[in-house]
Design a protein with these regions (language model features):
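Gly/Ser/Thr-rich loops at beta-strand to alpha-helix junctions
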Residues: 52-56, 120-129, 145-149
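A general structural motif
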Residues: 44, 115-116
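Hydrophobic/aromatic beta-strand patches that form the interior of the parallel beta-sheet core
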Residues: 48, 82-84, 120, 142
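Electropositive, gly/pro-rich neighborhoods at or near active sites that engage anionic ligands
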Residues: 1-77
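C-terminal functional extensions of proteins
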Residues: 129-194
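Glycine-rich phosphate-binding "P-loop"
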Residues: 16-24, 82-106
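A short, acidic, amphipathic alpha-helical segment used as a generic capping/interface helix at domain edges
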Residues: 102-115, 126-128
Length: 194
């Protein structure tokens, strides 16, 4: 296990984590600005992405992966890319499941059907339980959160207003496709993902 440290409040729990390996969140999130990013370790691997923007991610990887970043190590050639469209139980939208746990179980069952080496997760509150499920399968998972969309050249309000990200956005970046955008999307965190 590798823990990502982010907040000062983690000091209160440090005695529980002192035997674990950890990195700071900036190491995980700033892959696009590093000379040798951690994402290069995905080269040649079978990658599964669980994210609400599955269709946009597939399109960007298939059509523009070599144009998104000047550093080709940021988004390397995978052996394969598969996606699962994460359930978005947000903004009052119906999701087709009676409970949050039913949606989680459905995503677990979809993951069980896939052949992959590493899963990249950007699926909100579902990510940690899914990562635990993937670990129990004997596979690896990386919970990237919101920055996962940036790896595939998908921009949004959050990145266009952030001076750290702005220099890396080029003409090949896109907004999430309409098929990947829920109704009332802009009611969620001020529309920062869209």
């Amino acid at each position: 296990d590798l823990f990502v440290r982010w907040r000062i409040e983690e000091l209160f729990f440090s005695n529980w984590f002192n035997h674990k390996k950890y990195v700071h969140k900036s190491t995980l999130d700033s892959f696009f600005s590093q000379q040798h990013p951690w994402t290069y370790s995905l080269k040649g691997k079978k990658i599964l992405v669980v994210h609400p923007f599955s269709e946009t991610i597939e399109s960007q990887y298939k059509n523009k992966k070599k144009k998104l970043f000047k550093n080709s190590e940021v988004l390397p050639e995978f052996a394969s890319l598969q996606t699962i469209k994460a359930v978005q139980s947000i903004a009052g939208n119906p999701v087709g499941f009676d409970t949050w746990f039913d949606a989680l179980d459905w995503m677990k069952s979809e993951i069980d059907k896939k052949d992959f080496d590493i899963a990249l997760l950007g699926c909100g509150a579902y990510a940690l339980p899914l990562a635990a499920h993937i670990k129990r399968m004997g596979k690896k998972a990386v919970h990237m959160g919101g920055v996962l969309q940036f790896l595939f050249g998908i921009t949004c309000k959050r990145y266009e207003e952030n001076d750290e990200f702005k220099p890396y956005i080029n003409e090949y970046f896109v907004y999430p496709d309409a098929k990947d955008r829920p109704k009332n999307a802009f009611a969620v965190e001020g529309g920062c993902y869209w």
